[in-house]
């Protein structure tokens, strides 16, 4: 029965050859697609983490335009120091007046007076209608405030 052995051997050989070919090609393409998919997901994840970290750093350091706009809104308006020397009436909040704002006066008593006005006006028990007052600078006369 050599004929049966030959057929059997031929079928077995063909079967092994097909199996071997399928395994190699399937394994190679599967690892290639898995590697490409894995690297793509890994790259997207790294980019996402970097974008989030960069955004947080910008928010913390105040480098984002929205942060700067919020910081400008939170600051109160202060008059420039030179405008205190003019005779034009000024409208500003007296709570924001500090000694550093008054640089053009030569009389130290006027600085002390304005500092006292600042401490009185910034007291929290005042009614809300006095939050912003029109202020016109005048000459300091001790008799007017005693």
Curated annotation (Swiss-Prot):
This is Non-structural protein 5. The keyword Membrane applies. It is a single-pass membrane protein. The chain crosses the membrane at residues 36-56. GO terms for cellular component: host cell membrane; membrane. It is found in: Host membrane. The keyword Transmembrane helix applies. Belongs to the aquareoviridae NS5 protein family. It comes from Aquareovirus C (isolate Golden shiner/USA/GSRV/1977).
């Amino acid at each position: 029965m050599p004929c049966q052995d030959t057929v059997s051997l031929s079928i077995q050989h063909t079967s092994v050859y097909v199996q071997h070919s399928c395994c190699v090609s399937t394994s190679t393409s599967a690892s290639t697609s898995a590697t490409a998919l894995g690297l793509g997901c890994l790259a997207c994840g790294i980019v996402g983490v970097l974008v989030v970290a960069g955004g947080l750093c910008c928010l913390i350091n105040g480098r984002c335009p929205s942060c700067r706009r919020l910081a400008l809104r939170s600051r109160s308006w202060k008059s420039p120091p030179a405008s205190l020397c003019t005779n034009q009436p000024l409208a500003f909040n007296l709570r924001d007046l500090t000694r550093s704002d008054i640089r053009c006066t030569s009389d130290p008593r006027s600085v002390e007076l304005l500092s006292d006005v600042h401490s009185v006006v910034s007291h929290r028990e005042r009614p809300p209608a006095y939050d912003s007052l029109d202020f016109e600078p005048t000459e300091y006369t001790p008799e007017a405030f005693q």
